[in-house]
Structure formats: structure tokens, C-alpha cells
Amino acid sequence: AKTVYYMSMEFLMGRALGNNLINMTAYKDVKEALEEMNIDLNVIEDQEPDAALGNGGLGRLAACFLDSLATLNYPAYGCVEVPDNWLKEGNPFEIRREEYAKEVRFGGNIRFEKDPVTGKDKFIQENYESVMAVPYDMPIVGYGNHVVNTLRVWDAKPITDFKLDEFDRGNYHKAVEQENLAKLIVDVLYPNDNHYSGKELRLKQQYFFISASLQALIEKYKKKHGDIRKLHEKVVIQMNDTHPTVAVPELMRLLIDVEGLSWEDAWEVTSKTCAYTNHTIMAEALEKWPIDLFSKLLPRIYQIVQEIDRRFLIKVREMYPGNEEKVRKMAILMNGQVRMANMAIVAGFSVNGVAQLHTEILEKQELKDFYQMMPEKFNNKTNGITQRRFLAHGNPLLADWIT
């Protein structure tokens, strides 16, 4: 079976205790046992902080998907970044996994050289900043089936501790720069991105949890299965909206620069592994990044995006000769911007809307050019909720009456 990696900037999980007890079919037994000791289970539940990694429907959908995947016995990981004030009092359902920590790099420059042995092109990132991504794993309990999946939440830590030698030389800023970078990434979950520094922080946050998640999934896959060229046979990366779509060029980078695959082999794997869920029909809400920011912060990723765009536009011009208007609409790089939704559609094997009408509007209006060129990718997956949390747990009297 394939393992689903559900990449989302938001997971609006809610409290876990009551939900876990219901899914273990133990809620009534535990409630009655506590009542015999004059303890109210609801009071205990109220002590648990609300696990709110998000603020809207996007995050709640992601949480419901994790519940459903575990209940239907699909192996799955949710992947997200953690804000710094996340559950200050601790979380009994959370396990720190220091052994799976990954380095994530930002900025610097890319040096190109030929490997003297293999003759392959090598791209080396230099003069970069980096942080360690440390995962915390939370169990996602399936309903009545003894299945437990995982929500992996990434925290940022400095690679090295405070640099006392730099401080002693009077260079205070250099002494604390790594600590500041790590703190900044997790301090604010939704930075205001109507100015440059807010955009930069948001892009750092997105790349941070995506790079860490992909490094971890490749490591896990190789230990179990070996041949990285067959990754798509065992793994699906589901991108929940445009925020995680930097997963496309990051997977390409890992396959080419780290695993040594050719561009063609890496693209074959990536385009069979990545899938994209679209949540909006508003063109202005489809994420775009200024090229000057994107290329400065993620220089190697930008090179890969350029090549994806170049190769794709060759195909567009072959299929629609002389139609530069179509090229302009479908390009990933246009008017000084990186258009993330376009990249997700080009690279994914599946593009889904979240309601029948929504999907039809995507196909006939907003993404019409892509649908005409690659209709086989488009499909609908109507959203739903987990009735256990919102009915059985939220309104047990109504649930009893219905059943």
C-alpha cells in the first residue's frame, strides 16, 4: 500500500482526548469509571489546550482527512510547522523525535561543477543560513480498528548554540543569528505578508516544513524499499492548497542533487508522486511569490522552477503554436512572479476541487487552459467532516436519537 503524506500549512485538530476515546470505542466506559470516582470526564477534557495549528476550514478539512485516513486503514502522515507558543504547558499526546531532526537551508549562492568521477553536473549551495527542524509526533487514532497514524509537527532549533567566540569579538548579531532565524520561523504562524519581510518569513515557514518532511520521508522510504526511482509506487504527497507546493521543486532537488538522479528520472518520480488540492476559484488567492524574493531565499529551488517552466512551455507551444496568450496564462514564471498553483498543476498527477460545482468552475473557467491540455488530471473530491467529533462527541443526545 502507498503511504500518504498530507502536506498542509494548517491542521485545526481540536482536543484529542475525547476524540481518541471515541475512536477507541472507550468513551462511555471511561466516563462511567470516572463517575464512580466522582470525577467528571468533561472537566478533564477542558484541561486540554485546543490544538489549533490553523484558523479556518482549510485546517479543519486537513484534520478530518487524517481522522478518515486512519479510520479507513490508509497509512498516512500529516506534516505541518509548529508555532513557538504551541501548547506551552506541554502535550501528553506529543513525542519529540530528536533522532529524525533535519537541516533546512536558506539563501546563499549555488556553485556549479562537474563530478570528476561520474561527469554529472553538481550544484553546491554555499554561504547559506540553516536551522534544524525537530519533529514532534502526535498519534491520529482510527475508529474501532487499532490503527494509529501520525501528525508530524516540525519545530525550528538553531544548528549550533550561542556563538560565544563571535560575541567576545564584539559581533553580537553574528553570535545570535542562527538562534534568531530559528526563533523567527516558529514565532508567528501567520505573518502579515503585505510587506517584504512578512512575505520572506511566510516563504521560509513553508519551505522549512516541506524540506524537513520530504527529507524524512525519503529517508524512511529508502530504509524500507531502497530504489528511489520507485518512490511513487509507495508514496503520495498530497498538497493541501498552494502553500505546500514548493514540495515539487524541493523533491526534484533532493532526487537530483542528493540522490543523483537525472532530470528525466527525477521528473518521472515527482510527477507520479505529487497531487494537488485546489480550494479556491479566485485567481488572486492562488499563491504567487516575487521572483526576486524567491530566488534570493531559495536559489537552487528557483533554478529548478526555471527549468520546469522552460520545459513545460515548450510543450504548450508545440500543442498550441502561435498562441502566446495561452503561454502567458499557463507559465509558472510570469510578470516577475512564481505562480505556485500553475507549478502544482504541471507537476501533479491529480488536481482536485473540493465540491462538484467548484471543480466544474475550475475546469470551465479559472483553470480552463490546463484542463483543455491535461483533462485526465482533473477530478472532484467533495469535502466532508468527521461525524464522530461533530455529532457523536459534540451532541451525544442527538447522535443517540439518530442511531
Describe the residue ranges of each PLM region:
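A conserved ligand/cofactor-binding region detector
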Residues: A1-T403
